[in-house]
Curated annotation (Swiss-Prot):
It is an enzyme of class 2 (transferase). Signal peptide: none annotated. It is found in: Mitochondrion matrix. Keywords: Acyltransferase, Amino-acid biosynthesis, Arginine biosynthesis, Autocatalytic cleavage, Mitochondrion, Multifunctional enzyme, Transferase, Transit peptide. It comes from Saccharomyces cerevisiae (strain Lalvin EC1118 / Prise de mousse). This is Arginine biosynthesis bifunctional protein ArgJ, mitochondrial.
Length: 441
């Protein structure tokens, strides 16, 4: 359908994402400090190096991570994975991360550079095999190790560590590349037992976003004591339903890493898989990870819309997720959303070619597809397909109103079971091409 230029322009009004999504204050987990600097790796001289440090000595820390499935895994991914395996997820007390250079597809020299970053931090904290390393930026270029080494020495030498809000925000800034705002989330939680704890998360990513996972780095830290196997299970569950449920452009990076540190600074019994609080913490961590992951989509390169894809009443969770992902990754769906075109045929097409594990999950005679308004306007739901029957005479004016919203929902009811999955995606604009066409310049 063709819509008026006035309506299209209304949707594309500039949004101050920094003001909307960056917190102005917050409380943070006990026993963590962070440091940051501008090492000079980034050409514009902005912050590009950060360190997260566990300072709690009351009990050993635990760590877990989920890494990219890209075959060209970057040196930091391979190195950090080895550290975690050797340490068995215990006594990991630091994370060092740089932006501006991904240290990916850099061969043996890249592996050595990643190890040097780890060794430098290990030496500063006086512990072996206690640091994870992460990098993000341009692929296929070697790190400027003279600048990185000087930067690490500067952070520790000048005691540039803090636990206040500005320190955490600046570390979040130090990992940004094409991001338009730093992604920082912090929340306090209370367990049924009465124990209160804090989760703080940072992420970077705006493009090359597609499971599993994206050109994204994510860090979640907590002062709750969690046994290492339980922490890994918790993070894997949360990632499956958060960072692996987002899409900007369908590209999967070589550097994707989500890690979680638990330092046990809260004086309470360690949580394991058999603990009564385990399921509660797992669900709280999942909801928290979803909030953090959604910020990545909201910052999608050149995007003007945040779109929730809800697939419900599926036979299996996995198939609900596969269909939601297929819709979210479709370039034709994303460009139609940008153009505010109610072309539901593209949504059905994406559902139809989804590679389901069980073909019984999809019955073309039972499917319902709708656009859902998120601004409390009525009617909230606009049916596009009802019980497999296309609604050929939909209200085009109402469709235009819903598609003009900055936030909207695509709802798919499969009618074959009781399982559901959510995906978060964005539209695809001309600006995306501009950003990525000029990325290395």
């Amino acid at each position: 359908m063709r819509i008026s230029s006035t309506l299209l322009q209304r949707s594309k009004q500039l949004i101050d994402k920094y003001a909307l999504y960056v917190p102005k204050t917050g409380s943070f987990p006990k026993g963590f400090e962070v440091g940051y600097t501008a090492s000079g790796v980034k050409k514009n001289g902005s912050l590009d190096l950060g360190v997260i440090l566990n300072t709690n000595k009351s009990r050993p820390s635990t760590a877990a991570a989920v890494f990219t499935t890209n075959k060209f895994k970057a040196a930091p991914v391979l190195t950090s994975k080895k550290v975690l395996e050797t340490a068995r997820g215990k006594n990991i007390n630091a994370i060092v991360v740089n932006s501006g250079c991904a240290n990916s597809v850099t061969g043996d020299l890249g592996m050595k550079d990643a190890q040097v970053m780890i060794d430098l931090v290990n030496d500063k904290i006086g512990q072996k095999n206690s640091t994870l390393v992460m990098s993000t930026g341009v692929i296929g270029q070697r790190l400027q190790m003279d600048k990185i080494s000087t930067g690490i020495n500067k952070i520790f030498g000048e005691e540039k560590f803090g636990s206040d809000f500005n320190s955490w925000l600046n570390v979040a800034k130090s990992i940004c590349t094409t991001d338009t705002f730093p992604k920082l989330v912090t929340s306090r939680f209370k367990l049924p037992s009465g124990t209160e704890y804090t989760l703080t998360g940072m992420a970077k990513g705006a493009g090359m976003i597609c499971p599993n996972m994206a050109t994204l780095l994510g860090f979640i830290v907590t002062d709750l004591p969690i046994e290492s196997k339980a922490l890994q299970k918790m993070l894997t569950f949360a990632t499956t339903r958060s960072f692996n449920c987002i899409s900007v452009d369908g590209d999967m990076s070589t550097n994707d890493t989500i890690c979680m540190l638990a330092n046990g600074a809260i004086d309470t019994k360690e949580i394991n898989e058999d603990s009564k609080d385990f399921e509660q913490v797992k669900l709280q961590a999942t909801e928290f990870a979803q909030r953090l992951a959604q910020l990545v989509v909201r910052d999608g390169e050149g995007s003007t819309k945040f779109v929730t894809v809800n697939v419900k009443n599926a036979l299996h969770f996995e198939d609900a997720k596969i269909i939601a992902e297929s819709i979210s990754n479709s370039m034709l769906v994303k460009t139609a959303l940008y153009g505010q075109d109610a072309n539901w045929g593209r949504i059905l097409c994406a559902i139809g070619y989804a590679k389901l594990n069980d073909l019984k999950s999809l019955d073309v005679n039972k499917i319902n597809v709708s656009f859902i308004a998120t601004d409390n306007s009525e009617p909230r739901e606009l049916k596009l397909v009802a019980n497999g029957v296309p609604q050929l005479e939909i209200d085009e004016t109402r469709a235009s109103e819903i598609l003009a919203l900055n936030d909207l929902e695509v709802s798919v009811d499969l009618g074959t079971g009781d399982q559901a999955a959510q995906f978060w995606t964005c539209d695809l604009s001309h600006e995306y091409v501009t950003i990525n066409g000029d990325y290395r310049s």
